[in-house]
Amino acid sequence: MKTKSLTFALVASLATVFVASSCSSDDEPEAPVAAQVVGSYTGNEVIMVDNDESSNETKTYEITKTSDTSVDMTVPEWGMGMMTIPSFVVKNIPLVKSGNAITGNVASYSGTVKNAKGDEKAYVVSNVTLMFSDKTVVGTYSLKYGNMPFLMTTTFTGTRK
């Protein structure tokens, strides 16, 4: 009888050890939210100026980590006719994760860039929204560049390489 009790106790302890040390994905910590979206995203960029489509091209946006919960977005250079707007950065976009979706929003960001002639131009980016899901991003923002009289509203849909 004592052997049966000892055997039962041994089996119960081994079962507890195996259950407690199982190889479950729940045991591994999730990567920081910013690390989950960092990369180069290539896709379609549509720019609207005064409610008219001015540009519809394939572009590559860069998303870089600034902290565990925020990223910078580098917008590529683009041109219309004789005008070129240099690449610029929107910094410190805070990210929030809900389920499998990660979103980032910034009400307004301003900075300066140098144009092709070397002149410094101010820019203001407003209503920035980034929505990440798996390896896809959809981004929207409005841009006021230099002394341009109209806002340029951009929508970008890209896939991470």
Task: List PLM regions with ranges.
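Outer/extracellular conduits and scaffolds centered on Gram-negative outer-membrane beta-barrels
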Residues: V11-A12
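Contiguous, well-ordered beta-strand patches that form the walls/edges
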Residues: W78-M131
